[in-house]
Amino acid sequence: MNETLYCSFCKKPESRDPKKRRIIFASNLNKDVCVCEYCIDVMHGELHKYDNSLLALKRDRLRRMESSAYEEEFLLSYIPAPKELKAVLDNYVIGQEQAKKVFSVAVYNHYKRLSFKEKLKKQDNQDSNVELEHLEEVELSKSNILLIGPTGSGKTLMAQTLAKHLDIPIAISDATSLTEAGYVGEDVENILTRLLQASDWNVQKAQKGIVFIDEIDKISRLSENRSITRDVSGEGVQQALLKIVEGSLVNIPPKGGRKHPEGNFIQIDTSDILFICAGAFDGLAEIIKKRTTQNVLGFTQEKMSKKEQEAILHLVQTHDLVTYGLIPELIGRLPVLSTLDSISLEAMVDILQKPKNALIKQYQQLFKMDEVDLIFEEEAIKEIAQLALERKTGARGLRAIIEDFCLDIMFDLPKLKGSEVRITKDCVLKQAEPLIIAKTHSKILP
């Protein structure tokens, strides 16, 4: 005799009576879990309501993007002191002490300036809670930043680290992809579209964000003299950047791309956006040496060593950058200048181990998720650092090196549970396999 089934939700029994029909379906996975047709109808209705509300939210978000986005007040509740900002950078960026100081002070002054502007605005609105009697109503200029340093020296990382710490949106763009309006490529305004996307389409938040433009040296003119030919991605782009860097109202299409006369636009005021431009500036050291040397003819000048190039880059002046190919107007809008040194072998070893997000710590955590201990021998770490220096990719190239020799071991990682994987120098050079040691038996596995 079959047992009577009960619905796990309404607790009512199954009934085959045509007048009080209630058919119950039992789960194939768990026979103790049952549901009746009435409860299924109720759940279907609730899910339909949820889908409709979710669809409404998506439509509302799309409408914001298509029209004028939205504006919601965005203020920094607390502006950390320069020492505190540098301490944050110390956790992630190895070396570059002078650059970290310059960067921390510039970011602090920028957001202190924004805070002062907000207080002045509230004072003008006769807000009794704001007291600025000890301060004069002086207009404070924006302190945009120009970073000079080789690839992988930490330029982008510094900007990303402080933006994350301050919970400020940041947009990172490559200057080499930018072209003048009317030519194939990206318009300069697309940089602001990325910033708006990073701000979740909050215009107020975007207007207090950070824009990082890398490879700024790649859009330089070939000489100080103006070219008679069209300059699609050189001086023309610098002139277009000048408008947004100095602070102006810019109309940008909500979806990026090219502007259309009949399209909708989002208006962004760039006056309070912090612009950070960076580049390697290959060949700048020779320009500086030519200016500083007393040898007029220059025939006996010897080629500079790496250390000499780094030392002379710290002597850079505005005219050197003009000679390199940046227009004076753009340089004038980037008053804070800092030079980063290339990374030494010792610093590269520290980068692998010391930062909070150090690569070795990351890979050890990945292996630990499969209950495998990953050990790097000291000679192996030095060899990884040496390979990165030889490839001239800076710290950016470290991950590719580790991925290369760890690929096979990570492929078989799930079946190595409870083991220890030891990386040797020969393993890094791909002359030997990693040592896999079973903890329980303390011997090398085949």
UniProtKB/Swiss-Prot annotation:
It comes from the Bacteria. Disulfide bonds: none annotated. InterPro entries: AAA+_ATPase, ATP-dep_Clp_protease_ClpX, ATPase_AAA_core, Clp_ATPase_C, Clp_protease_ATP-bd_su_ClpX, ClpX_bact, P-loop_NTPase, Znf_CppX_C4. Keywords: ATP-binding, Chaperone, Metal-binding, Nucleotide-binding, Zinc. Pfam families: AAA_2, ClpB_D2-small. Component of the ClpX-ClpP complex. Forms a hexameric ring that, in the presence of ATP, binds to fourteen ClpP subunits assembled into a disk-like structure with a central cavity, resembling the structure of eukaryotic proteasomes. ATP-dependent specificity component of the Clp protease. It directs the protease to specific substrates. Can perform chaperone functions in the absence of ClpP. This is ATP-dependent Clp protease ATP-binding subunit ClpX. It comes from Helicobacter pylori (strain ATCC 700392 / 26695) (Campylobacter pylori). The gene is clpX.
